[in-house]
Amino acid sequence: HGDSFEVCKSCVDNGFSSVMIDGSHLPYEENVALTKKVVEYAHQFDVTVEGELGVLAGIEDDVVAEKSTYTKPEEVEDFVKKTGVDSLAISIGTSHGAFKFKLKDGEEAPPLRFDILEEIEKRIPGFPIVLHGASSVVQDYVTLINQYGGKMEGAVGVSEEQLRRAAKSAVCKINI
C-alpha cells in the first residue's frame, strides 16, 4: 500500500509481484496520472497494480483521511481505461484502522453501500474489485478485552453478513 510512485517503484525493484497505489487522497486527474505512472513501470516487470478510487476514513500506512468519500460509479470506467490498473479498490462505507466504527448505545454500524457496488459492477463488468478496511470485530472479543482492562467500547466492524454479500459480487479481495 503506497501513496507515491517512489514507494511502489521500490517494491517492484525489490521483487514484489503486486503493488497497490493509493492516489485516492489526490484530485481525480492527479490520481489518474500517478496510478498510470505506477502501472506503466510495474507492468514492464509483470507486476500487477491495484488502484484506488474514493477515500476511506481512517489511517493506513501514513495515509490519513478524516472522512470517507464514496467512489463515484461514473468515474470507474474512465479510471480503469486511462490507468490500466489490474484491480480497483473502492469506497462503499468501509474504513481503515483498528476500531472501524465507534458507536454509542443503541446505534448500529452503517450498512455498506451495495447500490454503489452494483452500479460499479454494471460499468466495469467482471473487473476485479477490492474492499479495504472491511474487517469485522467479534463482539465476544471486545467484551473479553474490556473485561480485562482494554478500552474498546463501542468498537464494531463490517458485519459477517455484509462481507458474505460482498464476496458474492465482483469483489475479489477483501482487505482487513
Q: Predicted segment positions?
A:
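Short catalytic/ligand-gating loop segments at beta-alpha or beta-beta junctions
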Residues: 131-136
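Alpha/beta enzyme core
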Residues: 2-128, 139-156, 160-169
